[in-house]
Amino acid sequence: MNINYPAEYEIGDIVFTCIGAALFGQISAASNCWSNHVGIIIGHNGEDFLVAESRVPLSTITTLSRFIKRSSNQRYAIKRLDAGLTERQKQRIVEQVPSRLRKLYHTGFKYESSRQFCSKFVFDIYKEALCIPVGEIETFGELLNSNPNAKLTFWKFWFLGSIPWERKTVTPASLWHHPGLVLIHAEGVETPQPELTEAV
């Protein structure tokens, strides 16, 4: 049975959710954003959309409904490049996925690593497929010093006593706030951007 959604989703759409685990809660606090997990739609299996994601322990493909169910209170939002994607661009995005699957999750969120984490996974797919940065690479110093809500004691504990201030990373928040993305639909998100009134 085909699952119906409130909007028409497409390959390349970025799915934002909120994982309730403690680590991901600290990611939200550090980046001052409701979302702490992202994936990317890469197709449809005849019943549901398929989402590629980097998660613990390995990057994989799941269905959109399962992806949403893992979110706290099933909150989610979907964004798309404001200009939309051509069929060739969608194909290029899909072509980037296989080589990135079954990669270990990097719990230290180091961008310059062979391991994956969710925002790096989506950021790199767009960068390699379309030469479009849909987020921002920043250091932990820039991230944590820019937000008074960040709990440094947690991150010192997480990094075994010493925060790697110069380590580069990319956060779900930087994707969420990227000006080139427009909101297609949101469920349970308190302050979403205005939804599109016209087709992209």
UniProtKB/Swiss-Prot annotation:
The family annotation for this protein states:
To E.coli YiiX.
Specify the protein name. Uncharacterized protein YebB
Name the species this protein comes from. Answer: Escherichia coli (strain K12)
What gene is this protein a product of? yebB
The record's section on Pfam families has: Peptidase_C92
Q: Sorted alphabetically, which InterPro entries does this protein's record hold? A: Papain-like_cys_pep_sf, Peptidase_C92
